[in-house]
Amino acid sequence: MMRQYELVERVQRYKPDVNEALLNKAYVYAMQKHGSQKRASGDPYFSHPLEVAAILTDMHLDEATIAIALLHDTIEDTTATRQEIDQLFGPEIGKLVEGLTKLKKLDLVSKKAVQAENLRKLLLAISEDVRVLLVKLADRLHNMRTLGVMCEDKRLRIAEETMDIYAPLAGRMGMQDMREELEELAFRYINPDAWRAVTDRLAELLEKNRGLLQKIETDLSEIFEKNGIKASVKSRQKKPWSVFRKMETKGLSFEQLSDIFGFRVMVDTVQDCYRALGLIHTTWSMVPGRFKDYISTPKQNDYRSIHTTIIGPSRQRIELQIRTREMDEIAEFGVAAHSIYKDRGSANNPHKISTETNAYAWLRQTIEQLSEGDNPEEFLEHTKLELFQDQVFCFTPKGRLIALPRGATPIDFAYAVHTDIGDSCVGAKVNGRIMPLMTELKNGDEVDIIRSKAQVPPAAWESLVATGKARAAIRRATRSAVRKQYSGLGMRILERAFERAGKPFSKDILKPGLPRLARKDVEDVLAAVGRGELPSTDVVKAVYPDYQDTRVTTQNNPAKAGEKGWFNIQNAAGMIFKVPEGGEGAAAKVDPAATTPKPGKRALPIRGTNPDLPVRFAPEGAVPGDRIVGILQPGAGITIYPIQSPALTAYDDQPERWIDVRWDIDDQMSERFPARISVSAINSPGSLAKIAQIAAANDANIHNLSMVRTAPDFTEMIIDVEVWDLKHLNRIISQLKESASVSSAKRVNG
């Protein structure tokens, strides 16, 4: 275990004026607080925060960050308090230590929800101070290095979370070495057989090519030296996870991989980068399409380098990366490379890491999505997609560079420029030509967005975008449009309700009733009424507490059934019902054009609907005995579907529109309900008559029949019948199946 003076010396090597007192005090305090605590491995617990601090010294971080690393588990696992740490080390360090503690306190049901909440909390904490990320990643790295002592289930869970969240997040923030080590450690536990196989093959390949790599390294160094370029050349081999991922994604065998080895060339200036590139291309043949200039166009994580691939001495492909030493430091440490902290009299007053980097721009954009209303699991899905995706670089007509994930469309581009441009997008010109909005953008495309003030982003756009920002904005706009429709419906319902009550109505009149309704504003009331969450009579009573509902229904005056205050409801057979607004207990009168039910009985026996909203059956129909559900249709009331209806899949992502409803029937119910049967019958004289006889024998009425397909030996048809309930329908289908004239019969749902 590292001694106190050794830690101070490690920091002094890169920061001679280190605040030794702060480091010594944090070391002693953390060691005393953790005391005799042990890790799962049996090692003293204090060895963990000490190793986390050591990892951060490798990044050349300041003493305040090192102190935070030493203290990061004290509040959670010892008797230490935030107040005590504030007094000893200052409020800034105390705040960050407490923030790291909160990241661990989770009690969620699903693994996915835990990951989502972990990521959400981490990103919000990073937005306040990036040192949270640096300590958290170092903490995760040491835990991964010592993961072998855990049980298998826990190893797998931690490794998967590391691969899904922490490794790509380190990459997004530019910390490539950290990302690679996290990936390799996670790969080892997620797929140990594959890790072992790839590792062994790479070791064999390295041994076989060691001499060749040394020769190329020497050749490159000599070329640069002859031309006056001060350069260092270092060979490198792809990591096992990188090799395995490429094999999996591209369907290649190990033998088919051609760029396992590469070289990194580091020079002093940007000018030397391009001079070195020219020398390389004049010495060896380059592979077309493999040149990338990330110096002129940096990645979103601030990575800068020139990539090229050449045909080497033995005709194999060799990848080269050319960069300055400063670029190499940023590529290795990412945001940590920007953390040049300078003591200004207090360890709690450092220069903050620059927030103007591309990595921070991505972070800010990601955090903005947290306020767009996505649930945590959706946020996790969208952010994980962006963590892993490669990039394309496109331009506005004025030359502004827009970086997008691979697979992005003009809609993503529009939202990347500005949310208002995305919301008003109706078309796009790509390189001067009008292209479909689903077009996948490519590197170098110039995109000009066509706009309209009347545009409302359709929900279908969600399937066309690749960025979380676009998806969140589309979802927000869709919710806003639906809410507007609900508000409009609620307005009409309340106008009628207040008119029935003989009371004046306006939006301003609703304001005094807001406290009684427990609603924040008038629009919230209108939307709640439109959604069916709030009965209109409750609103009237909230505004006029002395109001008494004296509406007349057919229970006490059947003659009123045709007057204002009734809704027309049409079932799938086209029958028109008059349903009162008075609620479930009110009677209903069937339109004279339709079949008349027994006197005093309801025509639509459904419970659970709002009395203020019109109700109708879906076209495929439902019969008593079916499990049913109501779907709120903005501006159209409630539609009743059988639970097995395929049409319900369109509402899977809109749970707020689902209403729990049920049948309300009794033995005296005489209403019939439409159902549809698909029949395949033998094509012979009398077959149709036998089918009609089965329906008649079961007291069912066939009100429509259509031939779907006719062949020499059979006929397929759709029969619409009217039945009392599900048992009645099943009995008819069963007897049809038993008929010698019928080869198959089944109910049609949708």
Curated annotation (Swiss-Prot):
Its EC number is 2.7.6.5. Residues 45-144 form the HD domain. Residues 390-451 form the TGS domain. One of its GO terms (molecular function) is guanosine-3',5'-bis(diphosphate) 3'-diphosphatase activity. Keywords: ATP-binding, GTP-binding, Kinase, Nucleotide-binding, Transferase. Residues 676-750 form the ACT domain. SUPFAM superfamilies: ACT-like, HD-domain/PDEase-like, Nucleotidyltransferase, TGS-like. It catalyses: GTP + ATP = guanosine 3'-diphosphate 5'-triphosphate + AMP. Residues 587-613 are annotated as: Disordered. Disruption phenotype: Cells show morphological abnormalities such as branching and swelling forms during vegetative growth. It is unable to persist during stationary phase, presumably because of nutrient limitation occurring during this growth phase. It shows an important growth defect in human HeLa cells and in ovine macrophages MOCL3. At four weeks post infection the number of viable bacteria (deletion mutant) in mouse spleen is markedly reduced compared to the wild-type. The deletion mutant shows very low levels or absence of VirB at all time points of growth. One of its GO terms (biological process) is guanosine tetraphosphate metabolic process. The keyword Oxidoreductase does not apply. One of its GO terms (cellular component) is plasma membrane. PROSITE patterns: ACT, HD, TGS. It holds the Pfam family RelA_AH_RIS. InterPro entries: ACT-like_dom_sf, ACT_dom, Beta-grasp_dom_sf, HD/PDEase_dom, HD_domain, NT_sf, RelA/Spo_fam, RelA/SpoT_AH_RIS. It is an enzyme of class 2 (transferase). Belongs to the RelA/SpoT family. Functions as a (p)ppGpp synthase. In eubacteria ppGpp (guanosine 3'-diphosphate 5'-diphosphate) is a mediator of the stringent response that coordinates a variety of cellular activities in response to changes in nutritional abundance. It is necessary for persistence in mice, essential for intracellular growth of Brucella and required for expression of the type IV secretion system VirB and therefore plays a role in adaptation of Brucella to its intracellular host environment. This is GTP pyrophosphokinase rsh.
